[in-house]
Amino acid sequence: MDGLQSAALEVLERRLDARSSAPIAVAFSGGGDSLALMLAARGFARQTRRKLVALHVDHGLQPPSAAWADQAEATAARLGVPLVRLAWTGPKPSSGLPAAAREARHRLIAEASRSLGARVVLIGHTLDDQLENALMRGAGAPVGALREWAPSPVWPQGRGLFLCRPLLALRRADLRAWLADEGLGWLDDPANADLRYARPRARLALAEGVHGAPILEPDLSPLADLWRVTPWGGVAIDRRGLQRAAPDQAVRLLQIAAACASGAQGLARPGRARGVMARLTGDKAFVVTLGGARIAADVDWMTFEREAGEMERGGLAPITVEAGQTRVWDGRFEITTAAADLRVEALRGHAAGLGDADRAVMLGVAVSARPALPVFRTLDHERAAPRLALRGLRAHIEFESPSCRPLCEDRLAAAAGMTTREAEIGTIARMAKSLRPPYVKAGSKD
């Protein structure tokens, strides 16, 4: 079984940073796939002297789930790996349970990983899971291909966090044979055989020799030169370049750009993005919305900004950031304050209260983007004036304390596949230092 471990180690060595001091998180259900993964990851952790931490999520969906957590913890301890127990609490949905459980699991794992300082979570998906996804997709389920390396699917909890799947080319039966040779037992969740759900049905079909068409995800790397991030957290895409791109690539880039500019948790529906693409024929200017983003297209550029009208539908809600805390506002800006409690809200309705310096900064921002910019207000003064969070918009964004970090750039780079290994996380520089599309009218009135 050395070949299996070698295959997993090859992925770990290629994707992870051997010199990093950050811990490595591994999602550990106690099942056979995650146990095989932890066995392989333990070898890498020993080789690189990095700390490995197992994360176990108790979904609370089966009566013995607490006992399963105990067993998982005991197995991890036997392998010398500390385990953190996480629980999905609260009411559970009456429909769409697998999807809700998956979202809760990723959210809990992302939050725990961030608190540990981990930047990568190892996931035990196998080739069988990939083949099951193909069957599920063929049956109409909205599932995509599993990738060896991908950003966390939850936002903003998963910002800066990546998933690595070292077992994706390996078969489940081979991994279980390896575990048996090692004298290790694993948990079998009866839900995996519950034919009321799509995945167990796909698993049964796969065992009977049925195969689905492979799921092909668009490769966005050829489009890397088409997009830029504006200094206020929007996105600009080269219109003509997008027109020349393959349709599936163009649609996916539109979906991602809209999510990053709007701060939305998920992607707009492909049909809506294809509708936007249909309007790109020729060079006629237009304005349209997609997934919470306002898209303005002129001859040269498509610009994506937060749709300010979302305020009327409950978006852009204010938040309070306590001293020493970091929070995300509107899915777009990470706010950190060291000394004073802050209220963070949208600029809309507060522009008249800005000081001269902040107003000068605001006038360098596209008029349509201004209402959705973040402003601070300290809570220790009853009549504190609002302060623009983005304190400078020259060649790049300059920050003061409290700090405000736009998340659009890193998120888009991750989703577009530009971050391919741990050492690259947070290092992709795509800020538009010289980009000043014609829609920016410096000195325009508010």
Segments the model singles out, each with a brief description of its role:
Residues L61-A66, A193-R196, A285, E307:
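Acidic, metal-coordinating catalytic cores used for nucleic-acid/nucleotide bond scission
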